[in-house]
């Protein structure tokens, strides 16, 4: 599974990129607005920090303007994935931009039917929102299973399942078990994947025993 971080915080992105485990970044206008900086400047800076896909979202709602915005975003860097909403205009935009060689992330997916349409439109990524479905008492993870099964039925479909709206480490684990190709995760949740109380307890014990020996490696 690939790990993307869902943030526009440059410091957080640099810290996670330094681990060598970060495969990409997803952003949206809300995340970038929190930085108080120019949208295009932030996106360009992120593209310079990570080599993998950086999702940057259009803000228009009609296909002609989405396409124009998408082309402008794609010029920022080769690793831009233009993010478009799962609407008919978004699907039209996806078809055009992917035809021009631009990566496209189709976002706000809440059904398997939507995911099938996105794949037909040539989407590089489809972003089903797990947490938001859970919020309305639907099974967000079941959607990942459904999309995986449909895509596997048609090997010609190359769209990657990008699990989004992830709230917890269990969401990440369950998405991996369901066959998601990518999980985009908030920084705190991503860092928390390495945490376990027994790991901490074991490390404390090892260090206490080592200290008693009076030895050093360096």
Curated annotation (Swiss-Prot):
SUPFAM superfamilies: Aldolase. The keyword Ribosomal protein does not apply. The keyword Heme does not apply. The active site is at 83 (schiff-base intermediate with substrate). Its main location: cytoplasm. GO terms for biological process: carbohydrate metabolic process; pentose-phosphate shunt. It is found in: Cytoplasm. Keywords: Cytoplasm, Pentose shunt, Schiff base, Transferase. InterPro entries: Aldolase_TIM, TAL/FSA, Transaldolase_3B, Transaldolase_3B/F6P_aldolase, Transaldolase_AS, TSA/FSA_arc/bac. One of its GO terms (cellular component) is cytoplasm. PANTHER family: FRUCTOSE-6-PHOSPHATE ALDOLASE 1-RELATED, TRANSALDOLASE. This is Probable transaldolase. It comes from Parvibaculum lavamentivorans (strain DS-1 / DSM 13023 / NCIMB 13966).
